[in-house]
């Protein structure tokens, strides 16, 4: 069992026969009245998001999520193919189960495939990836006095904001959880 007061991003639990993952949470302590936890939850089966408020003492059964390392092979339009690194079995997954999780992942990289009771519902990319900048405008010295950013396209086709000193051909580290530039490699 997990109490609502212990919620963190990524926690999964069962509620009304469904499995939800906490996307956002906020502990609220109003001046008058009891404290509560405001959450944004994602139904891991349907992908729908809902907002729900809990009492911090509410308890729900924790959902056991299996995470298995698999190699992302390729996509052929609507299906994305992953290979089990131990048994070499291939697993096709539809875009509806993956969402934007692969926008920073290159082919042949290892990702975690998430499942509950044998039903695959999504993937988890590595927390940090290193990608090459394939397109960005040149930054000029003296453009700004503060840390300004410019748009850049990385080798997977995703768009990201980078500092002005990053140029085409640079390798950069990206946090896949937030989609933010971390550093130049």
Curated annotation (Swiss-Prot):
Gene Ontology terms, MF aspect: translation elongation factor activity
Compartments where found: Cytoplasm
Pathway(s) it belongs to: Protein biosynthesis; polypeptide chain elongation
Alphabetic keyword roster: Cytoplasm, Elongation factor, Protein biosynthesis
Disulfide linkage: none
Pfam families: EFP, EFP_N, Elong-fact-P_C
GO biological process, alphabetically ordered: peptide biosynthetic process
GO annotation, cellular component aspect: cytoplasm
SMART domains to which the protein is assigned, alphabetical: EFP, Elong-fact-P_C
InterPro entries tied to this protein: Elong-fact-P_C, NA-bd_OB-fold, Rib_uL2_dom2, Transl_elong_fac_P/YeiP, Transl_elong_KOW-like, Transl_elong_P/YeiP_cen, Transl_elong_P/YeiP_CS, Transl_elongation_fac_P
Domain of life: Bacteria
Gene3D superfamilies per UniProt: 2.30.30.30, Nucleic acid-binding proteins
Family statement: Belongs to the elongation factor P family.
Role of this protein: Involved in peptide bond synthesis. Stimulates efficient translation and peptide-bond synthesis on native or reconstituted 70S ribosomes in vitro. Probably functions indirectly by altering the affinity of the ribosome for aminoacyl-tRNA, thus increasing their reactivity as acceptors for peptidyl transferase.
HAMAP family, sorted: EF_P
Alphabetical list of NCBIfam families matching this protein: efp, PRK00529.1
Name of the featured protein: Elongation factor P
